[in-house]
Swiss-Prot record:
Expressed by the venom gland. The active site is at residues 47, 89. Belongs to the phospholipase A2 family. Group II subfamily. D49 sub-subfamily. GO terms for cellular component: extracellular region. GO terms for biological process: arachidonate secretion; lipid catabolic process; negative regulation of T cell proliferation; phospholipid metabolic process. InterPro entries: PLipase_A2, PLipase_A2_Asp_AS, PLipase_A2_dom, PLipase_A2_dom_sf, PLipase_A2_His_AS. Keywords: Calcium, Disulfide bond, Hydrolase, Metal-binding, Secreted, Toxin. Nigroviriditoxin is a heterodimer of an acidic subunit A and a basic subunit B. This is Phospholipase A2 nigroviriditoxin basic subunit B. It catalyses: a 1,2-diacyl-sn-glycero-3-phosphocholine + H2O = a 1-acyl-sn-glycero-3-phosphocholine + a fatty acid + H(+). Its main location: secreted. Binds 1 Ca(2+) ion. The keyword Secreted applies.
Length: 122
């Protein structure tokens, strides 16, 4: 669920999802359109795509099992949906960590009105 995703982001990046990622670029936070602005925004775009494939799952509310060992996030056993949601979140949190060196403050509270044009396909 979203709280677990927030904790994963915090474990990986040492930053809270709010405010650092909740309104970042065109894809971090709710929805999205246009082109991802940078590597961080691309992580969020890919996360949206990952969730988009899980149409039969409650991606924002289903609880799943995960742990952190030796600095790596590990998804635990659960229902198919729980495991898939966890993997989407784990991959995104890891992606956000890898993108920390290109994080731009100017995209932190980016206005949706700047996200124009066609969206990429997943």
């Amino acid at each position: 669920n979203l709280l677990q995703f927030n904790r994963m982001i915090k474990l990986e990046t040492k930053k809270n999802a709010v405010p650092f990622y909740a309104f970042y670029g065109c894809y971090c936070g709710w929805g999205g359109q246009g082109q991802p602005k940078d590597a961080t925004d691309r992580c969020c775009f890919e996360h949206d795509c990952c969730y988009g494939k899980l149409t039969k799952c409650n991606t924002k509310s289903d609880l799943y099992s995960y742990s952190s060992k030796y600095g790596f996030l590990l998804c635990g056993k659960g229902t198919w949906c729980e495991e898939q949601i966890c993997e989407c979140d784990r991959i995104a949190a890891t992606c956000l960590r890898r993108s920390l060196d290109t994080y731009k403050l100017k995209y932190m509270f980016y206005l949706d009105s700047y996200c124009k044009g066609p969206s990429e396909k997943c």
